[in-house]
Amino acid sequence: MAPIEYLLFEEPTGYAVFKVKLQQDDIGSRLKEVQEQINDFGAFTKLIELVSFAPFKGAAEALENANDISEGLVSESLKAILDLNLPKASSKKKNITLAISDKNLGPSIKEEFPYVDCISNELAQDLIRGVRLHGEKLFKGLQSGDLERAQLGLGHAYSRAKVKFSVQKNDNHIIQAIALLDQLDKDINTFAMRVKEWYGWHFPELAKLVPDNYTFAKLVLFIKDKASLNDDSLHDLAALLNEDSGIAQRVIDNARISMGQDISETDMENVCVFAQRVASLADYRRQLYDYLCEKMHTVAPNLSELIGEVIGARLISHAGSLTNLSKQAASTVQILGAEKALFRALKTKGNTPKYGLIYHSGFISKASAKNKGRISRYLANKCSMASRIDNYSEEPSNVFGSVLKKQVEQRLEFYNTGKPTLKNELAIQEAMELYNKDKPAAEVEETKEKESSKKRKLEDDDEEKKEKKEKKSKKEKKEKKEKKDKKEKKDKKEKKDKKKKSKD
């Protein structure tokens, strides 16, 4: 491998380019002596030399460059410093080697500078570690603690941009919750089947009498040894079976004539421990479902009202976030979750799928076979609208979702009976009225007061203008009258003077 000639170091305050003076032909460059030299500042300065340091103009530029580097892109700032400080390729020397910390940045630099070969091997990482260790001494003009503060500020800004933290619209928890809910459903089903099979050796008839997994696990914990069941257990059994004394009595009767074998206390103890795990997982699954519903009503109330909390959460999870879902067209929302079928249909030139995740909605199951595609298209359109309202409204409310749901129900009825549906304009007007109605009385009163004060101000301005106009007109009339009087006096005087002259 070619020796390293230059080193690129990305600081939170700017980019630095170093020239590597280490004679890498020596076998020592591959031994511990190099790492020891790196730890000593005096010895490390003999290995590298600062060529140029280009500071960022501000925190915004630093964050922009950090985002570019994380995505493996060459920013304009990085391109400029490399262009100015790396020697151009010549006939004698065609390529230049540059040590970088992130190997994903290499292809982008190679694309911009074809004569630069990027290296991120162990030696390159050791040299970069040395620069990071002695940064305050290498970059002149920096005070103690400046680099740490810059790193902290940039780290917070970068993390905030990545997480996109928002108390009201933190949809990341929804994505994690729905993924965990799906996993729990699979695990509970698998574990419950194992409990049924295991306990079935002792009491095989119970599985047919009680098909529900959670109830079965609870009964296993209560019954344990089937021989302990008697008529006194009827009341407690009925409590576990939703007060169904008929099934409880059948359980007791079957326990007396059961074909199952007896099992030891140790085996029964293990069965009960596993049944307890299934019951606790089922309890946690219920808590998680309640949490998901609550979170969906906070983050995406209209989408939840329209299509349900679970399907809405699946749509958000599949899109990546509520913002991504709101940016997608209704046709994309319609087939979310059916990508494999879509690409298979495009490849074989067959019929594309009509629905994806929204297939599990009650609206599509209610529609007839010929109307399933039509209602799925209409429902996807309303889901797209609901997600946009949820994402961009400052105070999300479920009133728009309830009106959109009403429209979908009416459209479903229209396909069956031909009854006309509510128009979009009227539906939105109705939703806006409900939205304003739901606002607190104080807020509505404040809005009314603002409107009335604005109206009063306009009326006062009109009156003031009217008064000014009247004053102006009076003044003009007065001036005209004065001019007329002056003219009349002048005319009389002139006539008098003429008569006097004629007599003389």
From Swiss-Prot:
Protein name: Nucleolar protein 56
Subunit structure: Interacts with NOP1 and NOP58. Component of the ribosomal small subunit (SSU) processome composed of at least 40 protein subunits and snoRNA U3.
GO annotation, biological process: box C/D sno(s)RNA 3'-end processing; maturation of SSU-rRNA; rRNA modification; rRNA processing; snoRNA guided rRNA 2'-O-methylation
Residues the record lists as Phosphoserine modifications: 321
Lineage start: Eukaryota, Fungi, Dikarya, Ascomycota, Saccharomycotina
Residue spans of biased composition, Basic residues class: 468-504
Residue ranges, annotated region (Disordered): 439-504
Residues annotated as signal peptide: none
Gene Ontology MF, one: mRNA binding
Positions with biased composition (Basic and acidic residues): 439-452
Note: Present with 13500 molecules/cell in log phase SD medium.
Alphabetic keyword roster: Nucleus, Phosphoprotein, Ribonucleoprotein, Ribosome biogenesis
Annotated GO CC locations: 90S preribosome; box C/D methylation guide snoRNP complex; nucleolus; nucleoplasm; nucleus; small-subunit processome
Organism encoding this protein: Saccharomyces cerevisiae (strain ATCC 204508 / S288c)
Function: Required for 60S ribosomal subunit synthesis.
